[in-house]
């Protein structure tokens, strides 16, 4: 699996420094995930997660993806930003994933963003293998051989 940062935020560089990751060719590996600072993977992958950053308008990478997740923190003051990003996707099939939603506004978020919105728990371990598995497993289930559980 590869994680590729295709935005200008450079958050991945900060994380690589914190995790003290050493380069391996064009990527850095953290907990079995190859992380790239550029969209130039040096090998083939079954799964690639592209971090597009803040959604202004959908990028070609986002539009052409097999599965599109629009993930964003949805604290009360962030609702307009998440709503605008979702609106920018237009007719694209997108799975909205709202992160850090306080219990008090979860029902409101489902009314606003639709019943398809997934409410994800905050994961302070970016590379946690089991965090929010109920959201991500259905995306990859048909590609997994055997019964290895996330």
Question: Which role does the model predict for each range below?
Answer:
Residues 15-17, 35, 109, 135-144:
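Generic hydrophobic, helix-prone segments enriched in Leu/Val/Ile
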């Amino acid at each position: 699996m590869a994680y590729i940062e295709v935005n200008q935020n450079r958050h991945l560089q900060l994380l690589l420094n914190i995790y003290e990751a050493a380069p391996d060719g064009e990527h850095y590996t953290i907990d079995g995930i190859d992380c790239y600072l550029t969209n130039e993977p040096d090998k083939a992958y079954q799964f690639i997660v592209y971090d597009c950053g803040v959604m202004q308008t959908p990028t070609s990478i986002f539009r052409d993806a097999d599965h599109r997740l629009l993930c964003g923190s949805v604290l009360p003051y962030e609702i307009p930003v998440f709503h605008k990003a979702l609106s920018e996707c237009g007719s694209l099939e997108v799975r909205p994933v709202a992160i850090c939603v306080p219990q008090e506004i979860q029902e409101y978020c489902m009314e606003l963003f639709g019943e398809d919105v997934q409410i994800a728990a905050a994961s302070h371990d970016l590379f946690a293998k089991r965090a929010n598995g109920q959201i991500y497993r259905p995306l990859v289930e048909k590609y997994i051989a055997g019964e290895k559980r996330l």
